[in-house]
């Protein structure tokens, strides 16, 4: 005896394939712009490895958005790695990474905040701002770490036509502007 497959399964398969084809066309539209702009600049904030000090980076954008551990993305700025100072962190390397994409014109303010300073406090914090594609350092400085609970304004940079034009020291507090 020969078993016949019902024709409805063939029709259902045809419908599923047609729907999947339309979905693929919608996802891969020729000439469509990238959904996520590429990284243009990268900021690294680092301090002595192995310490339990938790240094937090705060970035105030020209749109008055504070990017930090509780608000990790503003569209053009993202905190990619929030370091907790080896407390609950699988790595002893103390490093925060911030990426910048499609920057808005205006001034970006960078400050650091000593959130927690247990056992072995860190003394210095290093901040480096790179052009992501060329590797060129636009800012490089080592500052004295603020005492626990304190914020330290570090530097600011100016953006025109999506490019960083100037970096300089700053005395503007970011946390004070976001509360």
Model-derived regions, located:
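N-terminal Sec-pathway targeting helices
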Residues: 1-18
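Intrinsic-disorder/low-complexity signal
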Residues: 21-179
